[in-house]
């Protein structure tokens, strides 16, 4: 990540370009991985990257209603896995990029003065280089010289959310890895 980062987007070390899906696909291809889009099944004897099940966007969009859609999303994930197994894939590793919080009564409101941060997200904020914050401050994974102020507990710096992520609760940080093997 860049020193003056204010958008939580990592940068490629070699070019300083913002990392994007374009670079993900390019780097996967350089390493011999396939990027499978939609219902593509690719070459089962190789390696592939598949994205499916969009709980994150659904949560941000639906907020309070999000739980109504979880079963359908999981059914879609199962269907995608079955399609890959039926196409001949022997092993599938299922991971997620982060967990999330859903609170029926809404996340409580946390406070951070606007003058301290360059980007105030729901559950964390990028601090200005000279800012002092009384709460928990952690280094950004992509650039440890960038400081991130964490909202306390399950609160958010922006009010009105029932669903969100970006904090340090167990639900947001625990990302299980599931390994599926074709029994045939």
Predicted regions and their residues:
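Feature captures the catalytic ectodomains and active-site-proximal regions of enzymes
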Residues: 1-184
């Amino acid at each position: 990540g860049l020193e003056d980062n204010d958008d939580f987007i990592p940068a490629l070390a070699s070019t300083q370009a913002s990392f994007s899906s374009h670079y993900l696909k390019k780097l996967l291809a350089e390493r011999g991985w396939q990027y499978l889009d939609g219902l593509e099944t690719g070459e089962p004897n190789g390696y592939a990257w598949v994205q499916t099940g969009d709980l994150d966007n659904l949560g941000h969009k639906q907020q309070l209603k999000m739980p109504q859609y979880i079963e359908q999303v999981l059914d879609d994930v199962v269907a995608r896995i079955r399609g890959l197994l039926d196409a001949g894939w022997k092993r599938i590793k299922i991971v997620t990029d982060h967990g999330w919080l859903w609170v029926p009564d809404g996340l409580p409101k946390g406070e951070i003065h606007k003058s301290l941060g360059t980007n105030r997200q729901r559950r964390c904020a990028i601090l200005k280089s000279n800012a002092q914050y009384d709460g928990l401050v952690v280094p950004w994974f992509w650039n440890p010289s960038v400081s991130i102020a964490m909202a306390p507990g399950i609160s958010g710096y922006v009010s009105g959310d029932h669903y969100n992520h970006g904090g340090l609760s167990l639900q947001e940080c625990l990302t299980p890895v599931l390994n599926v093997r074709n029994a045939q």
